[in-house]
Amino acid sequence: MFDCSHWLRYVSKQLEAAGGDFIHVSGGNTIKRGSSMPAPGTSPAPHAHAAEEIRRHLNIPVSTVARINEPWIAEELIANGKTDICMIGRPNLCDSAFANKAFAGKTEDIRPCIGCGRCLTGIMFGKPISCTVNPSVQSDAVAPAVEKKKVLVIGGGPAGMEAAYIAKMRGHEVVLCEKTQELGGLLRLAAVPIGKQELCKVIKFMTRRLQNAGVEIRKNCEVTPDMIASEFAGYEVLCASGAKAKEIEAFGCFRQTMTADDILSGKGFPGRKVVILGGGSVGCETADYLAPLIDDRFPANRDVTVIEMTDALMAGEGGAAKSILTQRLMRKGVTIELKSTVSKVDETTITYIKNGTEHVIDDADTLVFAVGYTPAPVNFEGAHVLGDCHQVGNLKNAIAEAYAFAKKL
């Protein structure tokens, strides 16, 4: 329960007496950004309880902010007396028409903010503002193409969906082919770990946008060179076929091996004691996914170890999200071995070197590879290659590259 101390009540009342129009309640600062800009997977409106308490002592409106990324959250906060005004920060950068779409009842057309914080990362280092989900945050203008073309997009992941939509908006005739039964690509797997479910909203939004734009979508359709030569002769071909999880062939002799993607997709079923090779975002999220619930006492829970060769987990991940996940792994009892390199693997043992000392794990059931991705092979002559099959990166990179290319097509 929020303790509205005497000084806080005093300051609020003094501001009201001085003629303030309303009091804005936030939290955190540039050092503790996790409070002012909460990470993905955290609860919405974390300062609402403080706003509600302050509101009880004032006669002017009170506002609050942070993770109010859907209209229903704002409506519920106001209806329940938590606040009078909801401030929309990052979601309004993600979709500048957020409020207008909410007012018009077009909530499904709101581009979803996932709370990743990459919009502000650039600004803090003197770079332009950007957005993972909205590559057009600086300029929404998409000019019609001077020459209308027929365009084939291969791959229904984020890059393929973005390229197909922008090409269609420019007046091209677009066909999008996806070899599986669902759009989304690796984003579907990225949405599986704890706290990442909001990525499903991105897939839903991008799919709905393609359908509304009239893009022809073919699922369960694996494009071949012969198909391009016959059915798609004369088309501009954009290949966004994604990437595949890497495996270390020399370590494949262990009793059970699989990739993190195998686990997240449900194709792989690891044993009780799991060793994850790689402490990047994918490795740590998979460890979190597999590890026991905090304070769970069931003896069948897994024992998870993460082996990372560098001196830090999740290099390149945002500070707030990284901190939350690291703390959760520690509370769950996940063993983390930094500055450690696996030197030898046989059918029953995993040997790694840390600080010059050799360590042996001889009771593991499963070895999981989370050592990155390799671009999917492109077998289409003359195709424009986009997204992860061009260069493996993050979601922001894939969407931005596809947007920039399609805008000039």
Where on the chain are the PLM-derived regions?
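Rossmann-like dinucleotide-binding cores of NAD(P)H-dependent redox enzymes
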Residues: L176-A213, A287-V342
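Short acidic, glycine/proline-rich loop/turn micro-motifs
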Residues: G34-P38, L186-A191, F251-G252
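Local beta-strand N-terminus motif with an aromatic residue
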Residues: G20, T83, A233-Y235, D363-D365
